[in-house]
Amino acid sequence: MRRTVLGIPAALLLLSSTACSFSTKDPNYVPPEPLPPLEQLKQVPVTEQTSLAAGNDVTAFVTPDRNIVCAMTSARGGHLNVPYEPNSYSDSANNKFAVVPVVHCELAAYPKPEVDDVADDCGGTGLGYLGGTVLLTPDSAVYGSCRSGVTEMEAEFGPKGSKDGPVSQLRELSEGQNIERNGLRCSAYNSGVACGNVSGGVAFFVSREGYQLVSDGGKTVRGSLKELS
């Protein structure tokens, strides 16, 4: 009996010394700065994209915070084949136009376009040049467009969004993952999305805080975010 009583504290001491371990956060640790968009797209491995297919030769995804939706798709004469907005891409009248690979994104919360980045005066359309959309082609990246009202992304996940519609049916691209289609690549990182034509040196980054438009292989950067942080 005496041996049993003495053995219990020893066993408890052994358990307490082996089972309990604590990690403390280094107060001096400084997380690395986010990579520039083109570098992020180059360095992160491409993920499997089959689960993100949205039909009709389109790959589409939303970010985990439901602030950005993107379609890696095609355009004909400015008509985009996207699964979340009405479009006339399939009209036979557009068959005369060349098919161009593009990435189109919409944001629920977004910054205004910088004055120097307004790409259209919207003359004669009765529309305004608004933010909340971005379009990547193999040669350029443009933030904003001529439109009125809200985008589908705003309608579903904006301040008064319904959280129900075509965007809500799309799958997530997880933070830090890359996806590629037709020579264009996208990455969800730094609470936003970067997409680009890596070989052409053209890219963009968008988030609710701001945007970057990158050209000339990273030598030219425009937009409301001069640096990512």
Model-identified regions with their sequence ranges:
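Extracellular/lumenal glycan-associated surfaces
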Residues: P64-G77, R181-G201, L225-S229
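Bacterial signal peptide processing site
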Residues: S21-T24
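A low-complexity, Ser/Thr/Gly/Pro-enriched, surface-exposed linker/loop concept
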Residues: N28-S51, G77, V82-L170, V202, ...
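Extracytosolic low-complexity repeat regions of secreted or lipid-anchored proteins
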Residues: P166, L170-V214
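Extracellular glycan-recognition/adhesion modules and their associated mucin-like linkers
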Residues: A53-N67, A71-T73, V115-D116, E175-R181
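Hydrophobic helical h-region of N-terminal Sec-dependent signal peptides
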Residues: P9-L14
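Bacterial N-terminal signal peptides that target proteins for export
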Residues: M1-I8
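C-terminal motif of bacterial Sec signal peptides marking the signal peptidase cleavage site
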Residues: S16-A19
